[in-house]
Amino acid sequence: MGFDAIWISPIVDNRDGGYHGYWARNIYELNQNFGSEQDFIDMVSACHERNILVMVDVVANHMGNLDTNFGVNTPFNDGSHYHDWC
């Protein structure tokens, strides 16, 4: 196909139903819907063997919970990490 890079959705653990990667719940764990950490490493290695770059999208400005139960987020699991609700 001639491409030399792949850009994929965020791979961090998401809240239930967050298939797209933009409802982060735990930034230290991978979304199991996308496979294991080893699967990711293997995929990146296979791409690099073919001179294909892999870019992973990231969400740097929010977590994915829809309520005030901040305890489900890692590492930002306290309300003091967030602005007050508008």
Residue ranges and their predicted role:
Residues 1-86:
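Substrate-binding/active-site clefts of carbohydrate-active enzymes
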